[in-house]
């Protein structure tokens, strides 16, 4: 099972029968301990700073239901369905480990909701990221007790209305079940998993745009040679250099370094004096440094995938139920610092792709440095026609906005809960910002690739490499040569629609042979 397939592809989930028996055994063990009054957090105590309040067994369901209702305190806009599905998928997987005390019936009901497209309404704001994602997961769990609201087929309705139509029965929770549902990192991890998937696609698009612009600008092939890049020792740099060679193979537009040297020699061979030429031995950084810039982006994504995948497959509850009350682990597995820091790293990597794309766009448009292309790629009479001048404003403004979004969240802890939660991760904030960055950089790359498609009309289009010609062909169908005859926003939206939807994902994957694990995989067994 992989998160993206369930969240975006709407693939259903099926719970492993053998693992459910382990879940049941742990659940029954906790119910017995609760009746025997073994002191255990969330079983017979209050929550958070109220841990010193002991709750007798007759209030077991009240305690759990009160937790869900009181902590369903989220605010802001609700998450879209695909993020909600990712959250539900990760929470089911974590609870299927069998260390939380949840009942199989609760997991089956969550899975049924997921498979039938019944999505809890989960507000985006309200999580501190430790003790897990209490607010969003409380909203996720409310429908299990017949409370809250759900969204089905895009319509938000009270839970019980939908349950009655679907023949579903809400549950009465036992000892610790409410706490098991909400005391974990599954909201930030679900959101982070989607951000990671989108970031990987943006990296492929960044490579395609980079391979396009070096041809449009007749850049040198030398910066992408294996020998020089391998000496830097970073594997990501070597991979990106190889991909740049692959994506530009067969081009008739780039310049060989030996040819550049020869041209300089011929230009200066008859003079022994200082002489300024119009020939540049090296290109500007935005045409030369892709292996170094995108190489570290690649390695950052790989590191973040490890953190996020490990968290998605972890036991992130508290307490963690072991064989006896004495062994049961009262700790802090709910803390989201791994995911929070992974998202901060990921947000910087995504923002850097936006920085590169914005600078490449400027080099493509600036009439002082983009020769022989027309200024701002105007189709005729530059000045009367503006070309992509307006599109650049959008890209530049978003790149600036991204600098704020890329600031770390994981170090911005504010104590809460009577000083009990005195160092928290803010992991869901970090994940939300990373999702926003992915949207923003997708727009910057859409402007750049629309401009590159325009630039191909002013160059020898047949001399581009095969992968880039296929991109131009695809984009040309929705965004033909721009002649100021329609709003620029329409062009950008059309290109964005191609690049960032499923057809764009498939095309980029087919063209960019990037060895990334394709999915964030889940394993319900411990």
UniProtKB/Swiss-Prot annotation:
- Disulfide-bond pairs as recorded: none
Name the EC number(s): 5.4.3.6, 4.3.1.23
Record has Disulfide bond as a keyword: no
Which Pfam families does this UniProt record tie to the protein?
Lyase_aromatic
Q: Which residues bind substrate?
A: 71, 183, 288
Annotated GO MF terms: ammonia-lyase activity; L-tyrosine 2,3-aminomutase activity; tyrosine ammonia-lyase activity
Q: Which Gene3D superfamilies match?
A: Fumarase/aspartase (Central domain), Fumarase/aspartase (N-terminal domain)
What is the active site of this protein? Answer: 41 (proton donor/acceptor)
Q: Which InterPro entries match?
A: Aromatic_Lyase, Fumarase/histidase_N, L-Aspartase-like, Phe/His_NH3-lyase_AS
Q: Summarize the PTM comment.
A: Contains an active site 4-methylidene-imidazol-5-one (MIO), which is formed autocatalytically by cyclization and dehydration of residues Ala-Ser-Gly.
User: What residues does the 5-imidazolinone (Ala-Gly) crosslink join?
Assistant: 130-132
In terms of superkingdom, the source organism counts as: Bacteria
Q: Name positions with the PTM 2,3-didehydroalanine (Ser).
A: 131
Q: Name any Gene Ontology BP term.
A: toxin biosynthetic process
**What catalytic activity is recorded?**
L-tyrosine = 3-amino-3-(4-hydroxyphenyl)propanoate; L-tyrosine = (E)-4-coumarate + NH4(+)
* This protein's UniProt keywords: Isomerase, Lyase
Under PROSITE patterns, the record lists: PAL_HISTIDASE
Question: How does this chain assemble?
Answer: Homotetramer; dimer of dimers.
Q: Which family does it belong to?
A: Belongs to the TAL/TAM family.
Name the job this protein performs: Has aminomutase and, to a much lesser extent, ammonia-lyase activity. Primarily, catalyzes the rearrangement of L-tyrosine to S-beta-tyrosine, which is probably incorporated into secondary metabolite myxovalargin. The aminomutase activity exclusively produces S-beta-tyrosine.
Please state what the protein is called. Answer: Tyrosine 2,3-aminomutase
The source organism is: Myxococcus fulvus
Tell me the organism's taxonomic lineage: Bacteria, Pseudomonadati, Myxococcota, Myxococcia, Myxococcales
């Amino acid at each position: 099972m992989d998160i993206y397939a369930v969240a975006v592809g709407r693939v259903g989930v099926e719970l492993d029968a053998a693992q459910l028996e382990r879940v049941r055994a742990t659940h029954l063990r906790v119910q017995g301990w609760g009746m025997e009054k073994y002191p255990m957090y969330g079983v017979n105590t209050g929550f958070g700073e109220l841990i010193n309040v002991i709750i007798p067994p007759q209030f077991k369901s009240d305690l759990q239901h009160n937790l869900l209702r009181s902590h369903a305190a989220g605010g802001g806009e609700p998450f879209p369905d695909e993020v909600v599905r990712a959250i539900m998928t990760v929470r089911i997987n974590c609870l299927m480990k069998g260390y939380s005390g949840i009942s199989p019936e609760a997991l089956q009901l969550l899975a049924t909701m997921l498979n039938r497209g019944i999505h809890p309404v989960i507000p985006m704001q309200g999580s501190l990221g430790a003790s897990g994602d209490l607010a969003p997961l409380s909203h996720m769990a409310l429908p299990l007790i017949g409370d809250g609201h759900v969204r089905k087929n895009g319509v938000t309705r009270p839970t019980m209305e939908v349950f009655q139509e679907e023949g579903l029965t809400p549950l009465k929770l036992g000892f610790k079940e409410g706490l098991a549902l909400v005391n974990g990192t599954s909201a930030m991890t679900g959101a982070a998993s989607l951000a990671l998937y989108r970031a990987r696609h943006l990296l492929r698009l960044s490579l395609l745009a980079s391979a396009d612009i070096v041809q449009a600008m007749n850049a040198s092939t030398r910066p992408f040679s294996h020998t020089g890049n391998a000496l830097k020792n970073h594997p990501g740099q070597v991979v990106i250099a190889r991909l740049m060679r692959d994506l530009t193979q067969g081009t008739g537009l780039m310049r060989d370094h030996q040819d550049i040297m020869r041209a300089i020699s011929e230009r200066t061979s008859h003079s022994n004096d200082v002489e300024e030429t119009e020939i540049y031995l090296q290109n500007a950084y935005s045409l030369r440094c892709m292996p170094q810039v995108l190489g570290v982006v690649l390695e950052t994504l790989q590191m973040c995938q490890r953190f996020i995948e490990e968290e998605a497959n972890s036991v992130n509850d508290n307490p963690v139920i072991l064989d006896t009350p004495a062994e049961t682990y009262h700790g802090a597995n709910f803390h989201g610092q791994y995911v929070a820091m992974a998202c901060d790293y990921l947000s910087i990597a995504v923002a850097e792709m936006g920085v590169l794309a914005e600078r490449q766009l400027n080099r493509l448009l600036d009439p002082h440095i983009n020769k022989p292309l027309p200024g701002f790629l105007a189709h005729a009479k530059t000045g009367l026609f503006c070309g992509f001048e307006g599109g650049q404003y959008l890209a530049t403004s978003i790149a600036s906005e991204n600098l704020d979004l890329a600031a770390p969240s994981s170090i911005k802890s504010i104590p809460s809960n009577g000083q009990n939660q005195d160092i928290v991760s803010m992991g869901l904030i970090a994940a939300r910002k990373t999702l926003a960055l992915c949207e923003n950089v997708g727009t910057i790359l859409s402007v750049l690739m629309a401009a590159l498609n325009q630039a191909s009309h002013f160059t020898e289009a047949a001399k581009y490499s095969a992968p880039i010609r296929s991109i131009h062909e695809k984009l040309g169908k929705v965004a033909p040569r721009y002649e100021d005859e329609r709003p620029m926003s329409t062009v950008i939206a059309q290109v964005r629609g191609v690049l960032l939807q499923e057809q764009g994902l498939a095309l980029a994957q087919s063209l960019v042979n990037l060895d990334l694990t394709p999915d964030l995989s889940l394993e319900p067994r411990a």
